[in-house]
Amino acid sequence: MTVYATVDSPLGELVLTGEESATAAGGTALVSLSLPGQQGAAEARNGRRLAPGAFEEIAEQLRAYFSGELTCFSIEFAPGAGTDFQRRVWRAVEEIPYGRTASYGRIAERVGAAGAGVRAVGTAIGRNPLLVVRPCHRVIGADGALRGYAGGLPSKEWLLGLEGALAP
């Protein structure tokens, strides 16, 4: 069964959706985490059951992250989202350390799609359903400029500032 909950954050109310899982902490594997006003955000109430308790562990990790106490999430993601290429890109994004950034070109190189593949990498990153916890906010332009973010550039800038990843 698909469940959802909302969690207050410095970025506004986050919407978490998940699937029941026997192996995940709290019994729920995360399907999506959406920011307020996000392009392609999950519709929380359409056919989903409100279950705040199902996300207690995830909510606690988010609170610790937003207060600067957590630098690496330990969350089970529901399987099956994305194409093979998107999943390769998302795994590469997950490897970017807290407080660091990587360019779209660097991610393209890591997944074997250098050159023209940079645009495809950008598209795959734009389809990441797990904002914040799968840190696509850490991907920037080759020139160091902040580029697109489904949650909006102000949120991306705020997250990078929290992590100390913005150049002075």
Predicted regions and their residues:
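Major-groove DNA-recognition helix of helix-turn-helix-type DNA-binding domains
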Residues: 133
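Short, leucine-enriched amphipathic alpha-helices that occur as contiguous helical runs
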Residues: 82, 86-90, 118
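Feature detects long, helix-prone N-terminal segments enriched in hydrophobes
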Residues: 113-116
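Short helix/strand-capping hinge loops at secondary-structure junctions
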Residues: 96-99
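Low-complexity, small/basic-enriched stretches
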Residues: 1-74, 141-168
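Alpha-helical residues within the helix-turn-helix
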Residues: 109
